Amino acid sequence: MTDSFEQISAHNEELARDIVERASARGVTVSTAESLTAGMIASTIADIPGASAVLRGGAVTYCDEIKHRVLGVEQETLDRYTAVSHQTAREMAVGSLELYQSDIAVSATGYAGPGGGTEDDPAGTFYIGWAHRSADGGVPVVDSVRCHYEGDRSCVRAHAVTEALGRIAFVLNSME
């Protein structure tokens, strides 16, 4: 049995509350770059009291042109790998990190469904990218994960928020 949108959202609120509390206590800032979630990650964080000490901003970059112009995703990356790929998710996260000068950035790009997708990445597939400043302040640490969830559009998007918040929590844990 799959969780309902309401159940997923309640879980996301708990994750966001933990992130805001821990990031605020450490003076760590967060930013987002969102495509399929269209601002849901930033909104979930912003719903928590005290988020203004943590959330630097979020970019909704639904189309490829804006991913390129706002976040600096290379056109070659979009052409070669598509907007729904590890490479694009990583470049989106780095773009958010630089744009907002945050300590941690997370990105989400994918196919929420019910249509769209490819044979390799069907509807319900998304990529979460994350980037954070290295301990020595040098080149950012960047990674991504591919996820797939069956369900309606709203649940796929809510699961993407869960995965993104989980990556922020993961990075916060690594900073302890």
Tell me what each language-model feature is.
Residues 1-176:
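Short alpha-helical segments enriched in small residues
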